[in-house]
């Protein structure tokens, strides 16, 4: 069984990874956690200090959920590289693919 410390650390790890994965070029995000994530971490820390087994297992499920979401986003971006590209860039890439240069 995991200890509260390992669950909290794995939760931090997944939230940091989520911030890196979901950051896009259009969204200028500061380093660190969002306000919602900070509030969640404060709540998590308070709950894990109680050392209740049912709360610990719920947070383990949250970690598994975040991990699977991060993995899904990585795989989606790998298999659909044009998903986060605007229409003009898609046209330029398609033209370049067939040997044409699109006008500026």
From Swiss-Prot:
Keyword annotations of the record: Mitochondrion, Stress response, Transit peptide
Top-level lineage group: Eukaryota
Keyword flag Transit peptide: yes
Compartments, record wording: Mitochondrion
Major site of localization recorded for this protein: mitochondrion
GO BP terms in the entry: mitochondrial proton-transporting ATP synthase complex assembly
Disulphide bridges: none
GO cellular component terms attached to this protein's record: mitochondrial matrix
PANTHER family membership: ATP SYNTHASE ASSEMBLY FACTOR FMC1, MITOCHONDRIAL
Function comment: Needed for the assembly of the mitochondrial F1-F0 complex at high temperature.
Stated family: Belongs to the FMC1 family.
Protein name: ATP synthase assembly factor fmc1, mitochondrial
Gene: fmc1
């Amino acid at each position: 069984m995991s200890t509260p410390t390992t669950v909290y650390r794995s939760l931090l790890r997944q939230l940091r990874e989520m911030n890196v994965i979901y950051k896009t070029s259009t969204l200028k995000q500061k380093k660190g956690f969002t306000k919602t994530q900070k509030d969640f971490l404060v709540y998590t820390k308070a709950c894990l200090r109680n050392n209740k087994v049912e709360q610990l297992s719920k947070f383990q499920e949250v970690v598994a959920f975040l991990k699977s979401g991060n993995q899904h986003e990585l795989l989606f971006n790998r298999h659909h590289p044009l998903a986060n590209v605007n229409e003009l860039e898609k046209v330029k890439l398609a033209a370049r693919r067939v040997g044409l240069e699109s006008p500026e």
